[in-house]
């Protein structure tokens, strides 16, 4: 089997803040770069953790759609929180999108995240057939 590597740049997600693609396709798997609470026009989301989580998941959804996938094709999620006390509020939003389909997941507290944001989420998904 030949391994095909295809970078994905998504116009409806925030521009990359460094040297990376929004996602990388490897055959039929899609590895998404971490998304933070920034709008597609590169504005930091202010407000509650729930507001920020909504934007992060929307960014993930947009990159998945640009990659020929969707939230229901996600197989693994990694979540990074700057404050573990935000775990419950983040989960209340996460559960709206992943209620029946529940991918494997890790959630860890970290000392700091880029641009001083509260959270970051990355995912691995399968491409649509």
Swiss-Prot record:
Gene Ontology annotations for the cellular component aspect, listed alphabetically: cytoplasm; cytosol; mitochondrial intermembrane space; mitochondrion; nucleus
GO molecular function annotation: deaminase activity
Pfam families in the record: Ribonuc_L-PSP
Subcellular location: Cytoplasm; Nucleus; Mitochondrion intermembrane space
Xref: InterPro entries: RidA, RidA_CS, RutC-like_sf, YjgF/YER057c/UK114
Crosslinked positions (Glycyl lysine isopeptide (Lys-Gly) (interchain with G-Cter in ubiquitin)): 52
Keywords carried by this UniProt record: Cytoplasm, Isopeptide bond, Mitochondrion, Nucleus, Ubl conjugation
Note: Present with 672 molecules/cell in log phase SD medium.
Family, as annotated: Belongs to the RutC family.
NCBIfam families in alphabetical order: Rid family detoxifying hydrolase (TIGR00004)
Protein known as: Protein HMF1
Species whose genome carries this gene: Saccharomyces cerevisiae (strain ATCC 204508 / S288c) (Baker's yeast)
Gene for this chain: HMF1
